[in-house]
């Protein structure tokens, strides 16, 4: 039965295990919600605004079905966009987006209809009636979200995180420090960003010393607002020793507008990653490395819509083990590190790294891997090579608030099914299985990030 009680639960033990975890609170150490939207607490106007307006998963699949861009990110009305989505939605079967949006509809709106061209108008009208009472804060409480960590630039004032402590009840909203723009010396706008950091923190960032001082001040500012983790997007990690004099010369050259060589770009990024690691060591923050996303791969999308518009891909030609060796050994036992990989063929590398370094954790199946298929493969491999018990928990990695409910439910069901299968095969007693799914779903990530 579609989305029935046994949805994704493939054995009797799985049903018992899911009942142990389905109502646990949600802790999410990595997402892309905007704290401003939560604080302002304005209800959405329509179902497209909820499900499609910020979701590049939806955009990509609509493009795959031949929908014109004007019905995705263009000038058409939200209703026209929703009707266009519903018309092709049956083609999404097998992709997790099909299940996530139906879960949102069934669990949050209590509208148990299958999305199609025939039901689109009814769903539009029914959700329109219910949305005025479904504010962001109420939904977070209804989904039992206990803690969420947004992703924030070091230049941020964090004013809405500060306000959240005063006006948001029952949910803790914390920032995450994401200094990618500080490190990406090869990206357009780097100098302007460095100057902005200087203005924000009262430092002369034309010098390396001033820039690092501004970053330290930002780090402290985030700490004062409850931050517990940093986050770094690395296409291919390449972190090694770089002398400070070398980094200083590169910084000054880049700031003056001179073109850098590829070696200089690599050296600067390696130097900065080591600085970020030392900052995190001081505050005992978790360092999250998201590895393997080749961003803005489709030029036409990037030129017209900018980043995060559905033009990113996965690539497997990466030297992860070699690129992380220096960083991991320098911070061996000194820094909690979570490794997320986009290509599933990299899982053996990070799983065996975690097995070798007790302070390293494998992150949740991420982005293109957060389907039932991807999760099952990820969990089974991790259990067989490292410790499933040590998985760094589930992250929504989403810009869409309703994802907290649907994505977490899907993960907990798949986890229960994987562990339940071990019970059915006689590999694990049911008592230990209950403790395992509870730890992975809630206790473990809460202790790792917030303990």
From Swiss-Prot:
It catalyses: D-glucuronate = D-fructuronate; aldehydo-D-galacturonate = keto-D-tagaturonate. GO terms for molecular function: glucuronate isomerase activity. Pathway: Carbohydrate metabolism; pentose and glucuronate interconversion. It is an enzyme of class 5 (isomerase). InterPro entries: Metal_Hydrolase, Uronate_isomerase. Belongs to the metallo-dependent hydrolases superfamily. Uronate isomerase family. This is Uronate isomerase. It comes from Thermotoga petrophila (strain ATCC BAA-488 / DSM 13995 / JCM 10881 / RKU-1).
